[in-house]
Amino acid sequence: MDFKEILYNVDNGVATLTLNRPEVSNGFNIPICEEILKAIDIAKKDDTVQILLINANGKVFSVGGDLVEMQRAVDADDVQSLVRIAELVNKISFALKRLPKPVVMSTDGAVAGAAANIAVAADFCIASDKTRFIQAFVNVGLAPDAGGLFLLTRAIGITRATQLAMTGEALNAEKALEYGIVYKVCEPEKLEKITDRVITRLKRGSVNSYKAIKEMVWQSSFAGWQEYEDLELELQKSLAFTNDFKEGVRAYTEKRRPKFTGK
């Protein structure tokens, strides 16, 4: 399959999915989300694939939602496309947790919004020491999507997850390592080498064991995902109709602080 928003290739048992919209800091729109889901499905069905690696082209891993497209949707009162993106990014996190193969993510620069939560959905996140994980939703009048709070509360605890979501503070790579979100931290120039080292180690393991482990983890911790997804989409849809969301997007594109009114 030919992709336009991502790159996908398989080499020696490793499927590499590369976000390839560096001109917009790898922002998520509907096409890239659909391509990511398709690539995950291809990797799932391909018996030659042992491991899925996700990385990105450009200086930024991903800013999360494409704010330029969000501005267009706000101006056109096109709430449905915004809801569709929220639905798709949740499905991406779900697909990664349900993929019966190890998922390795290699990050550098900003990992914001939905991208930050998709990173939590990975089994191994290797981050350069320049990486920043940002729950940016509150800055534009939204709440976390991509299964964010479902994943974060389980990964780092309820209090820390709530604080990150409510403040939108950037979490640096070392702190993310301390919290357990990140597996390894290294200098940017060593990121590829360290990622390869982790993948090499994983390739020595049994694919049958990995499949069983991921199913056990799912059943023990994530079986309530569907109910959470319904709630997440319902609340995100209600927030997308608010004046605060419109103000948040406009403030971002105009490079100023938003003035929220609670309406």
UniProtKB/Swiss-Prot annotation:
Domain of life: Bacteria
Reactions performed catalytically: (2E)-decenoyl-[ACP] = (3Z)-decenoyl-[ACP]
E.C. number: 5.3.3.14
Record flagged with keyword Isomerase: yes
Listed GO biological process terms: fatty acid biosynthetic process
Gene ablation phenotype (knockout): Mutants do not produce monounsaturated fatty acids, exhibit reduced glycolytic capability and altered glucose-PTS activity, and are extremely sensitive to low pH.
Keywords, ordered alphabetically: Fatty acid metabolism, Isomerase, Lipid metabolism
Pfam family, one: ECH_1
UniProt KW Electron transport keyword: no
Pathway: Lipid metabolism; fatty acid biosynthesis
GO molecular function, one term: trans-2-decenoyl-acyl-carrier-protein isomerase activity
Complexes and interactors: Homotetramer.
Family the entry assigns: Belongs to the enoyl-CoA hydratase/isomerase family.
Function summary: Catalyzes the isomerization of trans-2-decenoyl-ACP to cis-3-decenoyl-ACP. Required for survival at low pH.
Annotated protein name in UniProt: Trans-2-decenoyl-[acyl-carrier-protein] isomerase
Protein source organism: Streptococcus mutans serotype c (strain ATCC 700610 / UA159)
